[in-house]
Amino acid sequence: MSASHEKPRSVEVSSTLSSLESSDLSEDRSDQGRHLTVGGKVVRIVIAFAMMFACALAPPLLKQVPVIQSFALAHENPIGLVESFAVGSCVLLIYGVAVVLALILCYVLGRTLDRGRHVSVGLRTDRRALLWLAGMILAALVVDLVVAGMLHVFGIAGGGQPLPQSPAWLMIVESFSIAFLLQGIPEEIIWRGWLYSSLGETRFAAVSSVLGFTALHILSQGGQQNLLEHLTYLAPPCGFAVTALIVRTISGSTWAAIGVHGGFHVANDLLSDRLHLPVGSITWVLQGLIWAAVGLLILVFHRRQRRLATSSSSE
């Protein structure tokens, strides 16, 4: 299964990055990327890897603090509005540490490694950025619905997995915290925010942003049983990383990429059991291919709109 889809996915990634280079990445800012030495580029990629590990480990380490452990044990089954609010706030604060750490590290890098360079993490919040964020979350829900529909047509949908029995509000808080505070926001700040900008928003920056992020998931544990599944498990992060890069470039906002990344995890968490998505290579490859296709469609539409705008202004 993996071999039959590996080539199309690599072709899609290559063509996407090529299109981006020829249109959206050929701005003046790319000059600072070309002025970087090979060593400077390698250092930045290594730092991105280290930052991602640091942000991922921060919440689990915080949970080991005795006070927090005691609070969690004493409020395993919260009763009443006040206790529920306290538990929900604690969950948000624990996972929010990853976001705070990512922002602090990017600030320090801006004051040291990138001092004097035009590097931006792209977190300016305005109406357009929020629309991109919401739109990509909605796209993530649609992607899972399409994957589920295809699997049902193929007759290979999963069985009826038992749904979580936690209170609905706690499921929503935990899903949001893990999808956005632990993964979507800090990881996109690092890969599509800081690293992409620090490398000059060039083709090399785009490739590094996508492939570096994808490669890290070889260490993830998501139900893989063998080598083939460890490889096909890379399809979703590769696919949505391509789309995250495209929308980051088109919108100029990392919030769009955060919508892709966080939306992917929210959709998986809330819909996988309800849509009977099987855990395995077929689901992962379909998700990766459809996400890459979404990114390519957005890119094609964007380029078409630019051509129409250019032709109308020249008349």
Task: Enumerate the language-model features and the residues they cover.
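Hydrophobic alpha-helical transmembrane segments
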Residues: V46, A50, L130-A134, V173, ...
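N-terminal, membrane-interfacial amphipathic/helix-forming hydrophobic leader that caps
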Residues: M1-T125, A148, V242, T249, ...
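Juxtamembrane non-transmembrane "cap" segments at the membrane-aqueous interface
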Residues: S251-H265
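Short active-site segment of divalent metal-dependent hydrolases/proteases
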Residues: P186-W191, S220, T243, F264
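Membrane-interface helix/loop boundary segments of multi-pass membrane proteins
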Residues: I185-S208, T249-S253
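Juxtamembrane helix-loop-helix connectors linking adjacent transmembrane helices
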Residues: L62-S89, R115-P186, E201, G223, ...
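Hydrophobic alpha-helical segments embedded in the membrane of multi-pass proteins
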Residues: Y233-I246
